[in-house]
């Protein structure tokens, strides 16, 4: 997704609040507008005065996007707007898990199927996104296609309000041009527009009815996980603590 250099890249100060946790952001207003057009249930408020601290900084210079955060070891530098948005969403998710403390972050897809709440586990590129896409097109409620919050003590799962993300190589799986028009297409990935699909918003809670696992053979086969093995498999797919830990203080 090409971006022309202009004043739209001037950085401004924003805050967003989720689960009583405040996240402070410095970023171009146009970038935040795009985030708001794809995220579900998030609200960003521009601050008239400079923030005393920041959790995420997004900058555009030398034709590159620079995304830095207190949860990153080093800034992420990419040349495509949607790739930058992807890094931004990851930082939001990691920060939310860090700031709330009560949630773990689960790598999974999650959706409804025949009235049941499903969580689908699997390795990267095992077929979770393809399965989620088929459920999306079928009109099912999508809780997550990559990351989900888990409150183990309460036994509930909570949506992050992230849009559907697809690799560009998955475009051939979308037969309908009408469906394609509901995605923002970047150099490497696609993001769904807000409100075009039945995506759960930030904070939507649900109980698990069935845990499923993609085949390790990458043949798109799916098996049901018995109840007594649920906890074991969930723990195997948690995002490691080093991803959500605070690593540095950002310099404005």
Regions found by a protein language model. Name each.
Residues 47, 99, 141:
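Short, solvent-exposed cationic patches
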Residues 131-132:
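Post-Walker A alpha-helix
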Residues 126-128:
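Conserved glycine(s) of the Walker
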Residues 1-14, 21-22, 28-37, 41, ...:
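Glycine-rich, often acidic-flanked micro-motifs
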Residues 1-85:
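Long, basic/Gly/Ser/Thr-rich N-terminal segments
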Residues 82-105:
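N-terminal pre-Walker A segment at the start of P-loop NTPase domains
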Residues 50-63, 104-114, 149:
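Short, glycine/charge-rich beta-strand/loop segments that flank catalytic centers
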């Amino acid at each position: 997704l090409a971006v022309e250099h202009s004043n739209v890249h001037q950085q401004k100060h924003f805050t967003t609040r989720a689960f009583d946790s405040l996240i402070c952001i410095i970023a171009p207003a146009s970038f935040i507008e795009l985030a708001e057009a794809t995220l579900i249930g998030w609200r960003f408020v521009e601050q008239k005065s400079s923030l005393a601290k920041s959790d995420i900084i997004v900058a555009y210079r030398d034709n590159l996007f620079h995304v830095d955060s207190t949860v990153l070891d080093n800034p992420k530098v990419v040349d495509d707007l949607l790739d930058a948005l992807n890094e931004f969403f990851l930082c939001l998710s990691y920060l939310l898990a860090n700031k709330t403390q009560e949630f773990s972050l689960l790598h999974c897809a999650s959706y409804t199927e025949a009235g049941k709440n499903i969580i689908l586990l699997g390795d990267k590129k095992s077929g979770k996104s393809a399965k989620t896409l088929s459920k999306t097109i079928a009109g099912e409620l999508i809780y997550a296609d990559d990351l989900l919050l888990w409150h183990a003590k309460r036994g509930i799962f909570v949506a992050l309000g992230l849009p559907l993300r697809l690799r560009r190589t998955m475009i051939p799986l979308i037969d309908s041009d009408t469906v394609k028009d509901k995605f923002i297409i970047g150099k490497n990935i696609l993001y769904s527009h807000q409100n075009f699909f039945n995506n759960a918003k930030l904070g939507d809670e649900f109980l698990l009815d069935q845990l499923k696992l993609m085949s390790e053979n990458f043949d798109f086969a799916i098996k049901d996980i018995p109840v007594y093995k649920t906890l074991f498999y969930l723990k195997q797919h948690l995002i490691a603590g080093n991803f959500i830990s605070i690593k540095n203080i950002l310099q404005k």
